[in-house]
């Protein structure tokens, strides 16, 4: 016969496990990232065959940190890497760069990997920040910047690439779908101040 304590232990164990999993998902929703006490998300990755880590940066959103991690792990391990967002790098190959690359047979430098990962993370953070007050939607969309096409499947925001006039919002200047950082300490030109 079971005692009340044994029954309580059996019943509470799954609830504790579910709560622990939920807490872990909230604190670390993606591989290779963690949240600082003050709310910033950071990404880092261990170098292959070494004890040292490559610092990938600090980001406002977990998605930006996870995308930076994905970029770094893809450069280090190639197409066989376990990614947070594998659909974003499907069919992509690494060419050129820091020291030969995954396909070139050489090792990439940690600085090159850090730089590439930080670029991707910063782009995702900028898209998230630019869209925070704008047009939200939950669809996959494709952007074109110059000669580079990329698919942004995990952004909840849309940038209107057909926008012909420049508009300024939350410290960013948006012209023809591209974002520029506006210096908020600089006084506007008298000629163009009415246009913004």
UniProtKB/Swiss-Prot annotation:
Keywords: Activator, DNA-binding, Ethylene signaling pathway, Nucleus, Transcription, Transcription regulation. The keyword Repeat does not apply. The keyword Ribonucleoprotein does not apply. Pfam families: AP2 (PF00847). It comes from the Eukaryota. GO terms for biological process: ethylene-activated signaling pathway; negative regulation of DNA-templated transcription; positive regulation of leaf senescence. It is found in: Nucleus. Residues 132-153 are annotated as: Disordered. Transmembrane segments: none annotated. One of its GO terms (molecular function) is DNA-binding transcription factor activity. Its main location: nucleus. GO terms for cellular component: nucleus. Residues 29-86 bind DNA. Residues 135-145 have a biased composition (Basic residues). Probably acts as a transcriptional activator. Binds to the GCC-box pathogenesis-related promoter element. May be involved in the regulation of gene expression by stress factors and by components of stress signal transduction pathways. Belongs to the AP2/ERF transcription factor family. ERF subfamily. This is Ethylene-responsive transcription factor RAP2-10. It comes from Arabidopsis thaliana.
